[in-house]
C-alpha cells in the first residue's frame, strides 16, 4: 500500500486488489460521507467505478477505480480539445444533478483524462445531496477560487454552484480562447456572483456551447463570402471605370 496524498479530511492510498488482480484507490476520510453510498449505486462513463464503501466509528473508507492519466491542469490543450472536455463534463454533471448530487469541487485537478481519451470526474469529498428545504449547507467545503459565494455559508447550494465552478474551470482551461466572443457570454453567465443570474441547468450550457459552434461555423463563411463579393465588386467597378475613361 502506497500513500499518494494527504489532506485535511483524510488520506489516499494506491493499493493492489489481489482478489480481482487490479490496482485501486483507497480513501480514508475523517467523518461520515454517506454520499459515497449513493455514488456506488450509480454508473457513468465519466465517473470512476466505486468498488466498496465501509464505515468505522470515525472514518469513511472508499475503494474506487484507479484512473491512469493526468489531470487536465497538467495537459496543454487546444480550444477544440477543451470544448470536447466541457461537453463531457456537462454530460456527467447533468447525470449527477438528475440524481440530486452536487459535486461542489469542480476544478481542473479533479478532472482526469483517462487512457480512453475521455475525462473522469473525481474527488467527491465535498459532494452532497441537494435538499430543497435547507437554507444553507451543513458542511462548508470546496476550493477557494472555484467555489461560488453561497458555498461559504451565505445560502443553500444547488446545481448553480457546480455551474459556477464549471465556468471558472472552463475559463482556466481555455486560456486566451476564453476571450473570444463565443465564450465570453457563456463564461460570464456561468460565473455570475448571484445564483439567479447564472444558467439554472447544465443542459443550458451544453446548448449554449453547441449554438456557439454552429454560429461560428456559419458566420465566418458568410463574412468571408461577403468580403469576397465586396472586393470583387470594387475591382470590377474600378476596371469598368478605367475602361470608360480609356474609351473617352
Predicted features by range, described:
Residues 2-37:
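ATP-binding glycine-rich loop module of kinase domains
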Residues 162:
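Conserved catalytic-loop aspartate of Hanks-type protein kinases
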Residues 93, 97-113:
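Catalytic-loop of the protein kinase fold
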Residues 43-52:
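Conserved HxN/HPN-centered segment at the entrance to the catalytic loop
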Residues 179-193:
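Conserved C-terminal C-lobe helix
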